[in-house]
Amino acid sequence: MSPIAIDTAPFQRARVNLLHPEDPKAVKSIVQLLQFNAEHNPDHVFCLQLPSKQDDAIGNPIRITHLQFYRAVSYCTQRLQEEIDGLHGPRVNEDGTVTKCSPVVLFMESNVGLLIHLLALMSLGVPVAVLSARLSPTAVQHLMSSIRAQSVIASPRLKGTIEEAIASDNNTPAIGVRMYTQRPFEDDLENSRTLDLPATNEESHFISENDRNVLILHSSGTTGLPKPIYQPHRYLLNYSECHELGPDDALGTVLSALPLFHGFGLVAPCLAMTVGKPFMLPPSNTIPTGSLIIELIQSFQPTALMTVPHILEEITTLPPEQSISALQPLEFVLCGGGPLKISVAEALAASGVNLLAHFGTTETGPLGVVFVPTPDYDWHYWKLRQDINYRLDEVDANSADGNQYKLTVHPFGWDSAFEIQDILLSRGAEYKHHLRAVGRKDDLIVLANGEKLVPRVLETLLMQDERVKSAVAFGEGKFEIGVIVEPTHKVSDEEDFKAALWAIVLEAGAQMDSHAQVSSPSSIILATPEKPVPRSDKGSILRRETYRVYDEEISRVYEVLDRASEETTALNLQSDSLEEDLKDLIQREIGWKISPSEWLQDSDLFELGMNSLQAIRLHRLLLSSLPVDSRERVGADFVYRSPSVSKLGASLRHLAANENGHRNDPETEIDELICLNSFIARQDATVLLTGSTGNLGSNLLAHLTTLPRVKKVICLNRRGSDTSTAHTDLVERQLAIAKSKGVVIDPESASKIEVIPCDPSADFFGLPAEVYTHLTAQTTHILHNAWPMDFKRNVASFQSQFQYLNNLLRVAHDTRLCRPSIKPRFLFVSSIAVVGQYPRTHGTRLIPEVPSDKSSIIEDFGYGKAKYVCEEIMRAAADRYPEMQLGIVRVGQMSGSSRTGYWNPKEHFPTLIKFASMVGQLPAIKQTLSWIAVDNAATVLSDILFAPSLSGIYHLENPIRQAWQDVLDIFASSLYINTVNVPFDQWLRNVQAAVQELGTEDERMEYDLLAEFLEKDFQRMATGKVILDTSRSRAVSETLREVGEISEEVVWKYVREWRRAGTLRAPLE
């Protein structure tokens, strides 16, 4: 292909005055800039859009002039007004205030169509949110809810993510989100050719310089979910001015390998509108790779390149005649979005490539200058703009690297300043404003492809486990992350400990974006007592110092990942079923979520939604199937070049030598295990108990072991850091845990206890065949009580719990197969949260002991949704396997032990009391409560488990209700609190203010985890508006029939126990 002809007529530049927006001759918005270019530069080329690749061929680019772009935007404006319900421009109210339409979300592939829609909505004065196409459904749902969006326009390929996000959203602000499918941009270009277009009305889209409800982008938030960032009109004008390009410098085309849904990607189109330098965009149906970019440069001969580090890194791995030589003629190669490896940059610079560093943030826009590098320029540094409001303060004049600075910027239209989190070094006195980043003050990790993530979800979930002292994610400049875990106690078997943590890592991954997941247990580094995780004097983790200390271990992690595992793949590259095996590999090994029946061997994997991390995992797996001497011929873009199973199969056959593969058949092993032995049924009960280390579980264990009918209680516990398998050690640890919760088990009862450590979500619990067979040979009753207590998690993050339940049901089923005379019993402990909305949907407070439906679950409460899913799994199992007796118990509010006073301080009401003690106030809570002490609850569960028959739904809550005011009066007395009856909402605000201002980090986290539940659901759930009917339970439980109210003596026990444990603290002042 030949170079693209570009209009060389002089480009008339519009007047832009960022620092003095009152300038009457200056344009005030990108919309006005659009119209200016249509009038003054109509035939100048704006953009060259390469069409979607067909059969691996690159077509000729679509040439779009400024006038054509303006016409397409105007046509799209009219079309959207007809298509989107409720779309309208700003409306002036009687009091002079302005009301805007709710934001419209753009969730699109990176092509010029995104720009057309963006400018169309902005010209209407409609707030527009641009979301990264790489976000997970959870992140998309969070953002749509945060900005109260009501409409979203999605590319056809991305509709599935939006549908999943909408389906999972029960939050009121985002109810009724309507999805519209993006039309091809070619339609807007074609249909606008003969359209009479009105001039843009400034008053219809421009409100004021400080109106930030114009463009909504997003970044990583402190909770690990993205946060919306609102920007004014000057934000995009800011992009258009980040240059020092003269008329000659603006000649030729810049190839942009940057996605338009990221801030960095807006640099090229905004510069095209200001200086007239056209930009070229790659096909939107393929992810840019080093080889693709080189192919485009060689085909169309642009004069400059804008890219991210990993593309340049890929380019340097290609043969020199195909790579670096193509970059050498370019006026500049602009690189930003993340750190570029020094070795790569040095190789490029030494070869004469004009590297140009760039820097910016979503909040501030571009901070670096785009220019053609001169001989005195040093590629290590980016040049700070001088047309923005900023302050550069020295923070360390004695650093070994040079003077360190912090940069504070006052973004255009903002009322407040924004401090850049990067630590910056200056090139020197002569080049003070030439800076480079040497680290970050926050926890943000920037991957090699420019993707950013905050790993707090992963780190927090790990550190909530009692076996983990600290967790630090790493991955800066790499393609994926790993995590350093510091165990609470010395670990004897590292691999077992990693396996035990893996379920937590997977749960975290379900809540994080696809690029932010840990791919393998081998990516977990265990800190040793000899090399603890570095901390400051205040005890906080020193992230960067941790990376330095564990530099060798981190390097080894990525070496192992690069080598991949030959045992994992086991592909026979000469097999006739290679394509079938490849599809199975994708389904099993890379986190693929699409059902096998929904895609074909010829389907484009990236069209189906394969992300960059999945492509990397697949690449590593495929490498292990090839002879060593063939692997070097498989570049990093191998999967991108062969983006379907059929193409991968053809490519692999071409590369492979004659090798035979082997695949194990786990189904055969399962069948053999089930039928290994047939044992004679015993008359005595053996109870398989889960969750035995919790408060309720410890009380259950103590009660069950006192029953004459119970011969043995098998505690199926999540495998922990203590890898001892000795029976005595395991039981002693179990007894110690129970004792820590005020539950003392005598030696005779303890002799009935057996402890089996396991991986709850692994097939057969990850147990050896003989141990699993031991379970099925003895178990007669299963009481499934285990459950993570976290009110912030969404339903998808409980996947391991659903697998846990299915594994237990398999035990019951296999028990029946091995011992036909046994009819196993299975009791699942559910929650009142499953029916929390029942009074609203059915018009009655008294909830019967019957199956519920989805409408009864508490809205936007993953805990309750997950319990509902488990109830439905139990009901389906009961229908399918009538030979098993299955029951469900929905538990209401349990309090601490009536005997010892132990009440887990992490539960919501003890935390509420902790907050009350901190602020010296008790809230006003009206109506009644129905607490049942945990020791009594354990007895009731046992009564139900051993009832004459077991089936259906039971409810467990105290039938005797007490006045909240009476109980709070006792707490006021025991806590010495004089300020009572503070309105609940006001009390919550007082707590929030005190915690945020004077609380510890742990206390702030406690509040964040519980605040939403207290605000939305506590008063409705806990004050008699939701009452569980206990008729069926009382019929089989004498304990529940005779239980009384929580006495004053018991309340005092709770407070004394919390004081003894140090949970309560003096009021914050």
From Swiss-Prot:
Knockout consequences: Abolishes the production of 5-methyl orsellinic aldehyde and azasperpyranone A(AZA-A) but accumulates 5-methyl orsellinic acid.
Sites bearing O-(pantetheine 4'-phosphoryl)serine, chain numbering: S612
EC class: oxidoreductase
Location of the region described as Reductase (R) domain in the Swiss-Prot/TrEMBL record: 686-1032
Induction of expression: Expression is induced by the azasperpyranone cluster A-specific transcription factor ATEG_03638 which is itself regulated by the azasperpyranone transcriptional regulator ATEG_07667.
Usage in biotechnology: Azasperpyranones display potential anti-cancer activities. Azasperpyranones A, C, D, and F exhibit potent growth-inhibitory activity against the A549, HepG2, HCT-116, and HL-60 cell lines, with IC(50) values of 2.39-14.42 mm, respectively. Moreover, azasperpyranone D significantly inhibits HCT-116 xenograft tumor growth in BALB/c-nu mice. In addition, azasperpyranones A and C can bind with four kinds of therapeutic targets for cancer, eEF2K, FGFR, survivin, and TNF-a.
Effect seen on changing Y863F: Almost completely abolishes the catalytic activity
Binding site for NADP(+): T693, G694, N695, L696, R719, N785, A786, W787, Y863, K867
Alphabetized GO MF terms: ATP binding; oxidoreductase activity
Ligand binding (AMP): H262, A357, H358, T362, A437, V438, G439, R440
Keyword Lyase (UniProt): no
Enzyme Commission code(s) on record: 1.2.1.-
Catalytic activity: 5-methylorsellinate + ATP + NADPH + H(+) = 2,4-dihydroxy 5,6-dimethylbenzaldehyde + AMP + diphosphate + NADP(+)
Function as written in the Swiss-Prot or TrEMBL entry: Non-canonical non-ribosomal peptide synthetase; part of the cluster A that mediates the biosynthesis of azasperpyranones, members of the azaphilone family that exhibit anti-cancer activities. Azasperpyranones are synthesized by 2 clusters, A and B. Cluster A is responsible for the production of the polyhydric phenol moiety while the azaphilonoid scaffold is produced by the cluster B. The non-reducing polyketide synthase ATEG_03629 produces 5-methyl orsellinic acid, which is then reduced to 5-methyl orsellinic aldehyde by the NRPS-like protein ATEG_03630.
Family assignment from sequence similarity: Belongs to the adenylate-forming reductase family.
Swiss-Prot/TrEMBL domain comment: Contains three distinct domains: an adenylation (A) domain that activates the substrate amino acid which is subsequently covalently linked as a thioester (aminoacyl-S-PCP) to the 4'-phosphopantetheine prosthetic group of the second domain, the peptidyl carrier protein (PCP) domain, as well as a reductase (R) release domain.
Annotated protein name in UniProt: Adenylate-forming reductase
Organism field: Aspergillus terreus (strain NIH 2624 / FGSC A1156)
